[in-house]
């Protein structure tokens, strides 16, 4: 997919993302010797996890619409270099697990070259690949990797996976992996919907020590809830499942929420996370363009992505 959009000219102060982004294959990205601030978008082309989870399909096209929405955003800091992995990680012939492994390898490689990696789905099964990529890279840096997951989501995504992985099993898989390897499972979820998770899922989350906040309690949260997560971990996996937001803001999702949170309720928390000096990876999932109106869901998430990028690189817009 090509990046394109409005062109006001070519002076630095009127440039937009589509005018500066460099689309490269993985080998070219790994050969890049730029050591400054750099972002790499990685696309994950998958409906398979949602199909297995009996959800409504369409998220495989989410990343395309995100790129369209991101394309026209103005450049505020020319020191930030934008890159896009040319080919999406693609689920072929229903082989979800192979795609997750490929994604993990891509993420680990890009992180080894100090890219701020932004993964764009696709279904939320993207999270298993992203997390394992972060962990794989972290293991090359320390014998005691501390990876904290902060998820904005209406669901725990800790369903059984004895019949295979899907878009609702990732964090149970990660929990089991961590237990087996003796790694702390530090999973924190914001926006949980009381009626979108069974009692078993609540019980399972509690048994694994998951910290969660109901959507109805979002206004009670502050930096005080977020900063301890950032302080005790060296790597932060920030994952946003778009169905956390209210249906009027995010109609184009796999599982729309009539009592979802509002973007302005999340932005302060996201800013706190984005400003961390810890090693941050961002991931977004579950945009289903076929159910969207005027691309409002893609526009919302694109705005949040860019906000996180700019905040992470200390770019203030006056």
UniProtKB/Swiss-Prot annotation:
HAMAP family: Formimidoylglutam. This is Formimidoylglutamase. Mn(2+) 1 binds at residues 124, 153, 157, 241. Catalyzes the conversion of N-formimidoyl-L-glutamate to L-glutamate and formamide. PANTHER family: ARGINASE/AGMATINASE (PTHR11358), FORMIMIDOYLGLUTAMASE (PTHR11358:SF35). InterPro entries: HutG, Ureohydrolase, Ureohydrolase_dom_sf. Binds 2 manganese ions per subunit. Belongs to the arginase family.
């Amino acid at each position: 997919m090509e990046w394109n959009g409005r062109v006001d000219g070519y002076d630095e102060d009127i440039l937009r993302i589509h005018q500066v982004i460099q689309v490269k294959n993985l080998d070219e990205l790994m050969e890049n010797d730029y050591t400054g601030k750099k972002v790499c978008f990685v696309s994950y082309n998958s409906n398979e996890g949602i199909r297995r989870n009996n959800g409504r399909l369409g998220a495989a096209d989410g990343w395309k619409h995100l790129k369209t929405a991101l394309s026209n955003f103005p450049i505020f800091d020319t020191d930030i270099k934008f890159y896009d992995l040319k080919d999406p990680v693609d689920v072929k012939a229903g082989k979800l697990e192979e795609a997750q492994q490929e994604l993990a390898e891509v993420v680990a490689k890009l992180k080894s070259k100090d890219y701020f990696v932004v993964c764009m789905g696709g279904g939320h099964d993207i999270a298993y690949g992203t997390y394992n990529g972060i962990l794989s890279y972290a293991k090359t840096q320390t014998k005691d990797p501390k990876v904290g997951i902060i998820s904005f989501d209406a669901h725990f995504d800790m369903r059984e996976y004895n019949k295979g992985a899907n878009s609702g099993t990732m964090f149970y898989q990660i929990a089991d992996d961590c237990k087996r390897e003796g790694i702390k499972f530090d999973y924190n979820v914001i926006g949980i919907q009381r009626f979108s998770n069974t009692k078993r899922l609540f019980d399972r989350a509690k048994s694994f020590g998951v910290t969660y906040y109901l959507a109805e309690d979002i206004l009670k949260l502050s930096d005080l809830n977020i900063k301890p997560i950032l302080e005790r971990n060296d790597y932060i996996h920030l994952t946003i499942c778009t169905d956390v937001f209210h249906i009027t803001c995010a109609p184009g999702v796999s599982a729309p929420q009539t009592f979802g949170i509002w973007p302005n309720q999340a932005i302060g928390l996201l800013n706190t996370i984005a400003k961390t000096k810890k090693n941050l990876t961002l991931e977004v999932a579950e945009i289903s363009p076929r159910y969207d109106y005027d691309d409002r869901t893609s526009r919302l998430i694109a705005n949040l992505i860019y906000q996180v990028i700019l905040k992470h690189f200390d770019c203030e817009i006056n």
